[in-house]
Amino acid sequence: MYDSRGVALHSELIHRWNHAFSILSIVAFPKKRLLFAGSQDSKILVFDLPTYNLIHTIRLGESQEETHTRSSVLCLTGSEDENFLFSGGADSLVRIWSIGEKTIRDDFLPVTEIATVYSVTDIGDIFSLAYLDSLETIVFGCQNASLLYVENLIQKIEKKSSDGVENINKLPHRRYDKFFDSLGPTGYSSNSLSQTSLTSLQENCGAAIIEVPSENIIKYAHYGFIYSINKLCPRFNQLLEKSSRTSGAEHIISSAGDGISKLWEFSKDKGQNTVKISLINDKIDNEDSVISQTIEFPFLYCGLTDGIIKIWDLNTQQIISTLKTKHESDVISISVYMDHVFAIDESGITHFYQNQVNHWNPQQGKILSSEIFSKSNAGSVSLLTGGSDGSLTLWDITSLLSAVPLSSNSPINASSTLQTTNLWAAYQSASLNNEEMLNTLRELISFQTVSQSKDTTNTLSLRRCAIYLQQLFLKFGATNSQLFPLPDGGNPVVFAYFQGNGKVSQVKGAKKKRILWYGHYDVISSGNTFNWNTDPFTLTCENGYLKGRGVSDNKGPLVSAIHSVAYLFQQGELVNDVVFLVEGSEEIGSASLKQVCEKYHDIIGKDIDWILLSNSTWVDQEHPCLNYGLRGVINAQIKVWSDKPDGHSGLNGGVYDEPMVNLVKIVSKLQNEQNEIMIPNFYSPLKDLTEEEYQRFQKITELANIDENTTVQDLITNWTKPSLSMTTVKFSGPGNITVIPKSVTMGISIRLVPEQSVEQVKRDLKAYLEESFKQLKSQNHLEIKVLNEAEGWLGDPTNHAYQILKDEITTAWDVEPLLVREGGSISCLRMLERIFDAPAVQIPCGQSTDNGHLANENLRIKNWSNLTEILSKVFNRL
């Protein structure tokens, strides 16, 4: 079945296997093209993917003939090289098998049980497993809320493979139990469960019997059954603060019935051949039992009761989205691939992607397990599900992932390996050539970082972009890079620090400076893509221009700055310290940036000397510019509403005060017939334009290729005078011309100049409107709401930084830059100056035709590469 876009609504069934008992756990070995399914009747079924045949059955715990459920296989996992299979279950044992290579001729698969791991304490059922390959450590979570682990497992197996007789009677099945092993009515006791079979196992297989050391048992690791354990990519270590990093450490996340998801670190104990465990974080509280979980880094997906799925950012430990299935039942299993979420509950499979929710029932009774994987080199992705009716079904979900590029070069196993593209590459050299920079920009543009959108897809994309930038800084050699979480749970701020390593000038009194580069990774929505000539989120290089959403505002200039600094640093030529502050909420007003800067002030730097940014364009297509002034803004909504419902002009017209009439009357008092703004004290702080500034504006009208009708007075009005615009009107009701709406809302946008106080104008505006409304003596109600605001900014175009930039721009373009101001606003600029007590300098990059917030956003490559060259000089000269 397909939707109106031709995208499949659910997957196609590839194959179905049937078994007499429930399928409780599954794991795929894509490279060996094998599937393993753990069953309720103490078996592990092994299937060959190319032929779909059952080629082997592993029987656990009892004789080869007897069917029983005492060793039900509740969880399975494998090593990354697929040479080892691990199982845990109802018998409190972890079993380990060596998996050989299947012979092509007769489908023979060498499977050898090489070890059994047990605990001397009663741990109950084993619900979850993870194998940490680099540490050869198996970790498992249990019914009694304990977390257990055995390190150096392969070494211990090799050492103890012929020694197990003294330990075999300590296994849970061999211990005397006062209840189960008591004398019955006959007065005789029967043989202990599995006594014969375990002896047979010991004699025939030579499997090692390994006891979990008591010091490796974390009692009450949770306060509930530990249902899930997932391991993190070893390079997750890079995301920790430098002081907290442990070389060679591995990490897991455990989740349990207590609702807490805990981050644990496993690391080699220095000087000893042991592994120690540390609890790193226990702040992720789902406030409900976690039945299942999976990781698609950097996100943790927790399946809860009542069909709830919570998505957490592991970097900031913040919840970023919540999904809900239509059927309010436990999310028994969850699988994720490239933001496609497959949630399993008793009603079937629910697929979430881009605000689309599709559901289908595979008719498997109650589905108990799931996994996403791909056949090696097949280029297709499959979903495997196991049901209570004994069925194991394989679904082709490639059509569901039609918007996602699939790679056939590497197998996918979403439960055991992390889906990360080139995110975790090691140290990378930085270059100032366009090809290297294009690779970085191409990655950045591919992230759909629309901060105005609250849908899950954009939210995840914004977080992925932040992680990408953090890793990019680290790969380029940044001394420190981390994400600063926003207090409201919004998009994190990316921080990076490059410590100057070049020689400081020998001039007397010269010292190293600390420069802050501000940028943002969020973008405006692309709108209707039919208005674009190219895909807005795929970088296109055409006719000397970069095209895509964000190339000009602000990802293109950001890449120029990053590569400039990284190149100097890697060459050992970065004279000054440079810090980057890159936010993800600029397009929605930078609401929490101030709190972040104040909280992390000491990390960012107490002694910032200069603030640089490139967040605007030239005034034309030909003349480079330096910007030294921006207007401020107050965007507000004025709402008038009635207690009465929508009315009819024929029945109710003239009977009572109408909200629309009230609103028109009060907003009409905001300006007089000469378009002067009537808010009290509005013009009082304004200063006259200096002769020097007038001459600058005169020069712009003479040199710049702008509208020939534009006068100096037009520039003065747009750049240095305040204004008030009435921008939107919304009302209740159907919009018919005869309907009197019960509520009406008007949007206004007030542009301020640097001399004006935003707080004072807000107070005066509110008081003026309230007094005007009071004079109407209306029975209706008034509400004034400020949506966002920004202070005006005025730099000093004669200071040291502007002079250096003027020199370098002149060298790069063979023409002096125009000194300009703008009528627009950057909400955080004045705030950054005030918090860090440093002057800001605005360096426009693109041309006036960049279409920053419009369709077909573009940036001339020459402008982009020249900015990079300019910055590589400026960062050292300041």
From Swiss-Prot:
It is found in: Cytoplasm; Nucleus. Keywords: Cytoplasm, Dipeptidase, Hydrolase, Metal-binding, Metalloprotease, Nucleus, Protease, Repeat, WD repeat, Zinc. Zn(2+) 1 binds at D553, E587, H853. WD repeats lie at residues 18-57, 68-107, 235-274, 282-322, 362-405, 608-651. The keyword Hydrolase applies. GO terms for molecular function: dipeptidase activity; identical protein binding; metal ion binding; metallopeptidase activity; omega peptidase activity; peptidase activity. Its cofactor is Zn(2+). The keyword Acyltransferase does not apply. Present with 1940 molecules/cell in log phase SD medium. Component of the GSH degradosomal complex composed of at least DUG1, DUG2 and DUG3. This is Probable di- and tripeptidase DUG2. It comes from Saccharomyces cerevisiae (strain ATCC 204508 / S288c) (Baker's yeast).
